[in-house]
Amino acid sequence: AIFKSYCEIIVTHFPFDEQNCSMKLGTWTYDGSVVAINPENDQPDLSNFMESGEWVIKEARGWKHRVIYACCPSTPYLDITYHF
């Protein structure tokens, strides 16, 4: 799969600027009683990451969330959000 992420670009300190980006992976089709999302650790697997001459990933971490929406108080929805 190919995933794309949008990052707000702030170039105040160009060319030494830093951006903080997020990528949220989850499902709206199946809730937490049907699908399990269990990351092996809080670091994403970057083994297939292709480096860019324009930027570097300095740090990347992920968190698992269990979200309850007002429409469905007894149904948890799961996601993993990576920040980099």
Swiss-Prot record:
The keyword Cytoplasm does not apply. It catalyses: K(+)(in) = K(+)(out); Na(+)(in) = Na(+)(out). Disulfide bonds join C7-C21, C71-C72. GO terms for cellular component: postsynaptic membrane. SUPFAM superfamilies: Nicotinic receptor ligand binding domain-like (SSF63712). The record marks R66, I68 as: Confers toxin resistance. Keywords: Cell membrane, Disulfide bond, Glycoprotein, Ion channel, Ion transport, Ligand-gated ion channel, Membrane, Postsynaptic cell membrane, Receptor, Synapse, Transmembrane, Transport. It is found in: Postsynaptic cell membrane; Cell membrane. It is a multi-pass membrane protein. Its main location: membrane. Glycans are attached at N20. It comes from the Eukaryota. One of its GO terms (molecular function) is extracellular ligand-gated monoatomic ion channel activity. One of the alpha chains that assemble within the acetylcholine receptor, a pentamer of two alpha chains, a beta, a delta, and a gamma (in immature muscle) or epsilon (in mature muscle) chains. The muscle heteropentamer composed of alpha-1, beta-1, delta, epsilon subunits interacts with the alpha-conotoxin ImII. Belongs to the ligand-gated ion channel (TC 1.A.9) family. Acetylcholine receptor (TC 1.A.9.1) subfamily. Alpha-1/CHRNA1 sub-subfamily. Upon acetylcholine binding, the AChR responds by an extensive change in conformation that affects all subunits and leads to opening of an ion-conducting channel across the plasma membrane. This is Acetylcholine receptor subunit alpha. It comes from Erinaceus concolor (Eastern European hedgehog).
